[in-house]
């Protein structure tokens, strides 16, 4: 507990931003704009009724229309929790049990961070995907390993795949950020088909995570950054939304000020990071990814698990895949990064991996 707080009043949430609420006409215009295909032309009366139903849900702010009582294990068993969140919560719990069960194979999560694929506008696969395939060959050849591939290019090429932006609840108060995230789906705002409830269990079940990404304007790709931001709930997030009565900012501030333990839900997992660029930024992106993972108390598998390189430095984009074909050194470096992660994961599971200081208590949680 902060000495000055001592159970007193929490600061009131600061407000003053303009309202984003729409009137009925504008809401229905935006809602109807998604039905442009001629197949919908004979269905205008039906669409009118559907648009009116959607407007009613929006007007009444029905974020989570289907709920049930939280039940045993929560601070307030009678609180109505969204059934979507309960399902996500159970999936995360199940993933943690798989992670902790030493009789299960070791699990690797291999992430392709590029949004490019031949299945949509770019017309060509990404180099990140090819590098991920090289890494996958290493994992697939090892005994006692299962690999889950998370291809973030699906955000740009697959129907119904979305990752919505983090709403930054953590910046209001740590306890307001729920684990897993409870901000989505928001049915009244049409914020549905969010992928993160499938992604959280992949991270939780993994003993090792390997991220392969290009540099996009001195940063990670936008799909990868969306996932990174939405993983904030894994680093200090509140696993019991009933303690904050849902999204009650004042209640969350009181909880944090009374003393928050910042649970590290992904701590102890090992990671590897491979970043490739064409001109500039690879080192900074690699460093920012590694720093982020370290801050969440994940541990680098070893020096060769972190790699930043340029492919076709200052060469035409049109021939970048040819440059990768010719660069057998980076191909082997990616294999070595995967081998390092694999070796680290197996050593950690057998109790032989030493991460000095891992069990120390930090005087600063934030």
Model-assigned labels for residue ranges:
Residues 223-238:
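A short, gly/pro- and small-residue-rich
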Residues 126-140:
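Short catalytic helix/loop segments, enriched in acidic residues and glycine
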Residues 153-183:
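Charged, often glycine-rich, active-site loop that binds/positions anionic groups
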Residues 206-207:
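An anion/phosphate-binding loop that grips the pyrophosphate of nucleotide cofactors and donors
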Residues 106-125:
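Short glycine-rich His-centered loop
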């Amino acid at each position: 507990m902060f000495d000055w707080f001592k159970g007193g009043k929490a600061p009131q949430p600061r407000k003053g931003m303009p309202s984003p609420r729409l009137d009925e006409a504008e809401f229905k215009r935006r809602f109807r704009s998604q039905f442009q295909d001629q197949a919908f032309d004979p269905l205008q009366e039906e669409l009118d009724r559907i648009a009116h139903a959607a407007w009613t849900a929006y007007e009444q702010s029905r974020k989570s229309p289907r709920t049930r009582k939280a039940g045993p294990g929560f601070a307030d068993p009678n609180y109505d929790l969204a059934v979507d969140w309960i399902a996500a919560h159970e999936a995360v719990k199940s993933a943690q049990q798989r992670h902790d069960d030493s009789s299960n194979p070791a699990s690797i999560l291999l992430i392709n961070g590029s949004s490019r694929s031949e299945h949509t506008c770019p017309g060509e696969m990404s180099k990140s995907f090819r590098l991920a395939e090289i890494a996958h060959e290493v994992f697939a050849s090892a005994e006692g390993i299962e690999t889950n591939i998370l291809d973030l290019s699906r955000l740009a090429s697959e129907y119904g795949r979305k990752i919505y932006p983090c709403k930054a609840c953590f910046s209001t108060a740590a306890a307001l950020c729920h684990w897993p995230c409870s901000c989505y789906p928001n049915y009244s705002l049409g914020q549905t088909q969010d992928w993160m409830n499938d992604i959280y269990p992949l991270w939780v079940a993994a003993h090792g995570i390997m991220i392969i990404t290009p540099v996009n304007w001195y940063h990670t790709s936008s799909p990868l950054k969306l996932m990174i931001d939405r993983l904030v709930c894994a680093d200090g997030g509140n696993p019991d939304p009933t303690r904050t009565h849902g999204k009650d900012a004042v209640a969350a501030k009181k909880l944090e000020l009374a003393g928050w333990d910042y649970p590290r839900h992904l701590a102890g997992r090992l990671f590897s990071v491979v970043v490739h660029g064409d001109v500039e930024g690879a080192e900074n992106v690699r460093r920012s990814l590694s720093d982020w993972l370290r801050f969440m108390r994940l541990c680098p598998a070893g020096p060769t698990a972190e790699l930043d390189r340029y492919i076709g430095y200052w060469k035409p984009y049109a021939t970048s895949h040819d440059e990768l074909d010719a660069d057998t050194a980076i191909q082997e470096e990616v294999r070595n990064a995967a081998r390092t992660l694999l070796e680290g994961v197996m050593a950690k599971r057998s109790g032989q991996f030493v991460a000095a200081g891992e069990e120390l208590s930090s005087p600063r949680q934030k």
